[in-house]
Each structure stands twice: as structure tokens, then as C-alpha cells.
Amino acid sequence: MLELTQTPQGVILLVKAQPGARKNEVAGERSGRLLVKCTQAPEKGKANDAIVEILAKALDVRKSRISLISGQTNSEKKFLIEDATIEEINKQLGIDS
């Protein structure tokens, strides 16, 4: 089950990043984290920027509403999706709440 945390600012989403993949995609859940694959290499924040774009598209939100709050140099990351609810995130990802 995907771990999501509601905060006054929005929803904290745990992500397992897989940089250097063949294509950009949200590839399901792994150990409570959303698995996000991106083609960018993990250098100079390129993969983080790509993951923000992938999440924005998957969640149908503006990139400016997504902030990386921890894991800048780690494959396990935390993102804040501003002004969102857990129900909205689950709906956009096709997860039954």
C-alpha cells in the first residue's frame, strides 16, 4: 500500500526513484513508495527535475505545486504535493482509497 501523509500544506508522497531507465514512467508501488523511472542520469539534479515532471503529468498538477523535501541525492525521496488531498492523489494514480 502506498504511504501518503496529509499535512496542512498538502500531501507527502514517498518515491523510489530509478534514474537511467529506458523510459519515463510511474511504475507502480514498491515497499510503500511510488516507483518512478526516468531516463535522466542522477547528476546535477537532472533526475530530480525529470521526476517532478513525471509526477506532475501523472497527478495532473502544475510542476510548481511539487517540491522535493528530502532525498536530493538518494533514490528514496519525499515530495510535497501542495494543496492536494490523499483522495485526489489516489484517484489520479488509480488507487482505491
Label each region the model flagged.
Residues 1-45, 49-52, 61-63, 67-72, ...:
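Contiguous, often N-terminal, cationic amphipathic patches that form binding interfaces
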Residues 58:
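Residues within the alpha-helical elements of helix-turn-helix
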